[in-house]
UniProtKB/Swiss-Prot annotation:
PANTHER family: TR-TYPE G DOMAIN-CONTAINING PROTEIN, TRANSLATION INITIATION FACTOR IF-2-RELATED. The gene is infB. Belongs to the TRAFAC class translation factor GTPase superfamily. Classic translation factor GTPase family. IF-2 subfamily. Residues 63-73, 112-125, 134-143, 179-192, 234-258, 266-276, 306-323 have a biased composition (Basic and acidic residues). The lineage of its organism: Bacteria, Bacillati, Bacillota, Bacilli, Lactobacillales. It holds the Pfam family GTP_EFTU. This is Translation initiation factor IF-2. Residues 347-357 have a biased composition (Basic residues). Residues 469-476 are annotated as: G1. It comes from Streptococcus equi subsp. zooepidemicus (strain H70).
């Protein structure tokens, strides 16, 4: 069943919500307010209870309404100079009502909704009556041309006419006269007739009307209905007025009691402070103050409403509905004003002097609190006067005045420089200190700040060991042996392409290993590994000895200041000579402890797992000597070992935690990127929730791929991390723009010279960030005179369509290192004729790019003299030219060779041969000591004894 709210029921039956709520409670329904809902049956029950009560009240109140109407009529007949008589006439009525009810009836408000509905019904009835009259006129016009012989049919339609007459009973009597006139006109014009049946019915209806149908006095009926409505309205107004008066009386009574209690408390308080003789004086104001807010406002308003020359005279000519509406509006204002009567009294009292009866003492003036000046003031450049005043608890006007006395014109919103602030603080006697601004975007401060770590929480951490050495000396094989796996066979060409970070456990202690590439291209990666390591294991093959990358690794380790453990590998080979390795390393400052040095030497065989335990024991011994400590309680900081772009995970970074503990969901800034640690995996590929110091982990959740070697730091919240990351990215972009060189007078010639150098544009895409760096650095080091490499773009990830579009626009070659192009990118590259080179070994990339650079140069040619000939005779042929007969004196003369005409050791002409003949035959060449004839293109001034030198231009192959 549907439910209804009480205010909807009140709206339907024309009652107030309060009455409906009270009636529902009296019927036993569980309701709380007008917004409560009841069932349909309960709603009908409430409505029926009101309808039953209304009929009783209307019958009971009809006699009272008659008395009220008679009293109003008597008051209207009385003249205006007799107001006393009208008041005397009103008093008996009031007396009778007071006799029946305890509170005087004072109807001031009406049910406007019911009045509007009644007026709307009357208007609808009037419109219907007007339509009926217009229909009667139309039907009367149709009566033209009726004959008297049709009256016999009227009796047959008598019943129908009687039913129709009931709808037209309210027509005025003047309409009959008009109908008579029309009927006479119809007798004069009988020829214009149509629709005979309708005319007969209309004539029968008029005859019935003329027969004297009973007329209803609508005015009397409307007056009776209005009297009933007024009686109902009066009853409702009486009940509301009684409720309002009762509530008002209770409210005023409570207010008087509260004020009396307050005044009594004040009186008792004064009794303790004043003399005993004056203890009884405050008794009089209590009564006056208690009576004041009740008597005065009510009397004033009643006199104002009963003035006969104002509203009553102005509303005398208005209609009943308008007049009642205006009274109701005034009554609502009266109720509102009576509720706020005390507020008005207080307002009036505030305008003038204090009330005579009020004995409240004036409020004492609150004295401003005096604040001590601070001893120190930490300021920042650009502080305003208002900010300084707030900090030192002084008025801005006071500071402005002091500045004016110092000769500085300033307002409270004006910024001050540091010197002015210091002078102002000296005037106040405060020690001024400049605030040290902390750069939140600076990650390096976490690594250099000694106060970042808590000495009480320092614990021992695992050592970070970097394995370094020359290419194919067994670095990855050693690490593979330590991890008991076989990833070494997966390296392309036996070369480690990027850093691998792994952690093993030996004798209950953990050791973190970093595997670095040994190729010359990975210098930056070796330097990066040495910067984050604690111990360096230098792998040297016993059969190869010290190699260039071995020396480089030694230099990196010395620069980082880390201890070096030398592992002489491949001692199982027949040509192994460990003593030669020890002596070669001694030449570079790596001296064994057996020779009195500081470096530990261990002879191992990574392939056959020989002396590996001894190597690990040496690592733990050196780590114990180094006393490696860390604080796991602080926010994590560390270094990026490697970074790559995964198709499904996005940016993936391999981090080495150096201090603190890294947790999942930590807000982090990595280099110029930022994000939140979404997932974290260890070296075994298992997900972990935290990473302690010296632990390598791979994380996801960064907005971009960071650079390998960047530092990272965990921030307090994501907002701070985002701000720091964006600021670092902005600074990096600004630095990159500043590195762009502009043409000036100083470097104009260098720029012009550089424009003559040819460039090979390349786009590098690799699997990890370290490989990208190594490739770019290696290609830039290629030295070919007149050609240089321009790296247009480098990034990690697969070759995509945007790379192909960029390569087409910049005429570049795409180099993919351990990556492949997407199908869409390959299709677009074929369509745009873009060259994509895919490689997995770095030195093959370098060789290929070097060949491309050499082919980019313009070919160089070298002149090669083929032979010489002397002109013995000339023949001039018309329309052909001059033919020179010659004899080859040295070498040969070929048909496609170029020739020089030399006369008296001076070159007269240099050009091509037009023809070469031996007797009458065209030949390709004429050898030594042979004769022949020739013609030269564009030259006919051949003379006897001229020397003809034949030569060709040969291309020089670049080395």
């Amino acid at each position: 069943m549907s439910k209804k709210r009480l205010h909807e029921i009140a709206k339907e039956i024309g009652k107030s919500s309060k009455e409906v709520v009270e009636r529902a409670k009296s019927l036993g329904l569980d309701v709380k307010s007008h917004a409560s809902s009841v069932e349909e049956a309960d709603a009908n029950k409430i409505a029926s209870s009101f309808s039953a009560g209304v009929t009783k009240n209307v019958q009971a109140g009809s006699a009272k309404d008659k008395q009220v109407a008679e009293q109003k009529a008597k008051a209207a007949k009385a003249t205006t100079p007799q107001p006393a008589a009208s008041k005397a006439a009103e008093k008996p009525a009031a007396a009778t009502q007071e006799a029946s009810q305890p509170v005087a009836v004072k109807p001031k408000s009406r049910n406007f909704k019911a009045e509007r509905e009644a007026r709307a019904k009357e208007q609808v009835a009037r419109r219907q009556a007007g339509q009926n009259r217009s229909n009667d006129r139309k039907s009367d016009y149709r009566q033209l041309g009726r004959s008297q012989g049709q009256q016999t049919e009227r009796a047959g339609h008598k019943s129908q006419n009687q039913q129709r007459d009931r709808r037209f009973d309210n027509r005025p009597s003047s309409g009959n006269n008009r109908n008579d006139g029309h009927r006479q006109a119809g007798n004069r014009d009988k020829n214009r007739s149509f629709n005979a049946n309708s005319r007969q019915q209309d004539i029968g209806r008029q005859g019935q009307t003329q027969a004297g149908a009973p007329k209803i006095d609508f005015k009397a009926r409307a007056a009776a209905l209005k009297a009933e409505q007024n009686a109902e309205y009066a009853r409702q107004r009486e009940s509301r007025f009684r409720e309002q008066e009762e509530a008002k009386r209770l409210e005023q009574q409570a207010r008087q009691e509260a004020k009396a209690a307050a005044l009594k408390a004040q009186t008792e308080d004064k009794k303790h402070r004043e003399a005993p003789a004056k203890a009884t004086e405050p008794a009089e104001p209590v009564a006056s103050m208690a009576a004041a807010p009740v008597a005065k406002p009510v009397d004033k308003r009643r006199k104002k409403q009963n003035r006969p020359d104002k509203a009553h005279d102005r509303d005398h000519g208005l209609e009943d509905g308008q007049k009642k509406n205006k009274k109701s509006w005034n009554s609502q204002n009266q109720v509102r004003n009576q509720k706020n009567s005390n507020w008005n009294n207080n307002k009036k009292n505030k305008k003038g002097k204090h009330h005579k009866n009020s004995n409240t003492a004036p409020k004492p003036v609150t004295e401003r609190k005096f604040h001590e000046l601070p001893k120190e003031f930490e300021y920042s450049e650009g502080m305003t006067v208002a900010e300084i005043a707030k900090r030192i608890k002084r008025e801005p006007a006071e500071i402005v005045k002091k500045l004016f006395m110092m000769g500085v014109m300033a307002t409270q919103n004006q910024s001050l420089d540091g010197d002015t602030i210091e002078l102002l603080m000296v005037d106040y006697g405060i020690e001024a200190k400049a605030k040290v601004e902390v750069d939140e975007a600076d990650i390096e401060r976490f690594f250099t700040d000694d106060n970042y770590l808590n000495p009480d929480n320092i614990v021992e951490r695992a050592p970070v060991v970097t394995i370094m050495g020359h290419v194919d000396h067994g670095k990855t094989t050693l690490l593979d042996t330590l991890r008991n796996s076989r990833v070494a066979t997966g390296e392309a060409g036996g070369i480690t392409q990027h850093i691998g970070a792994y952690q093993i456990e030996e004798a209950g202690k953990k050791i973190t290993f970093l595997d670095t590439p040994g190729h010359a291209a990975f210098t930056s990666m070796r330097a990066r590994g040495a910067s984050v390591t604690d111990i360096t294991i230098l792998i040297v093959a016993a059969d190869d000895g010290v190699m260039p990358q071995t020396i480089e690794a030694i230099n990196h380790s010395k620069a980082a200041g880390v201890p070096i453990i030398v592992a002489i590998n491949k001692i199982d080979k027949p040509g192994a000579n460990p003593e030669r390795v020890i002596s070669e390393l001694a030449e570079h400052g790596i001296i064994s402890t057996t020779w009195g040095g500081e470096c530990e030497f261990v002879e191992i065989s990574a392939k056959f797992n020989k002396n590996i335990d001894e190597l690990l024991e040496t690592v733990l011994l050196v780590a114990e000597v180094e006393e490696l400590k860390a604080d796991p309680t602080v926010r994590a900081i560390g270094t990026v070992i490697e970074a790559r772009l995964d198709k499904g995970k996005g940016a993936v970074a391999t981090l080495l935690v150096q201090q603190g503990t890294l947790h999942v969901q930590d807000p982090i800034v990595v280099g110029n990127t930022f994000g939140r640690v979404r997932a974290m995996t260890n070296d075994l590929g298992r997900r972990v929730k935290s990473a302690e110091p010296s632990t390598p982990v791979s994380i996801t959740g960064l907005n971009e791929t960071p650079m390998a070697g960047d530092h990272f730091a965990v921030y307090a919240d994501e907002k701070a991390a985002r701000a720091a990351g964006e600021e670092r990215a902005k600074r990096a972009l600004l630095k990159q723009r500043q590195n762009t060189q502009r043409v000036s007078l100083d470097n104009l010639f260098d720029t012009l010279k550089a424009g003559e150098i040819k460039t090979v544009n390349v786009i590098i895409k690799a699997d990890v960030q370290g490989s990208v760096e190594a490739l770019a650095a290696s290609l830039l080091k290629i030295d070919v005179e007149g050609v240089r490499v321009n790296v247009v773009h480098s990034a990690v990830g697969a070759i995509n369509e945007s790379d192909v579009t960029l390569a087409e626009a910049s005429n570049a070659v795409i180099i993919g290192f351990n990556v492949r192009p997407t199908p869409q990118a390959r299709q677009q590259a074929d369509a745009d004729d873009v060259e994509i080179r895919l490689h997995s070994i770095i030195y093959k990339v370098i060789e290929e790019v070097e060949e491309a650079m050499k082919g980019k140069l313009d070919p160089e040619y070298q002149e090669k003299v083929l032979g010489e000939a002397i002109i013995r005779e000339t023949f001039k042929v018309s329309k052909v030219g001059t033919i020179g007969g010659f004899m080859v004196v040295n070498g040969k003369v070929t048909r496609d060779s170029s020739v020089r005409v030399i006369r008296d050791s001076v070159v007269i002409f240099d050009g091509k041969l037009a023809s070469l003949k031996h007797y009458k035959d065209d030949v390709k060449e004429i050898g030594n000591a042979q004769e022949g004839g020739l013609m030269i293109e564009g030259f006919n001034d051949i003379k006897v004894d001229d020397t003809i030198e034949a030569y060709v231009m040969e291309e020089i192959i670049r080395k």
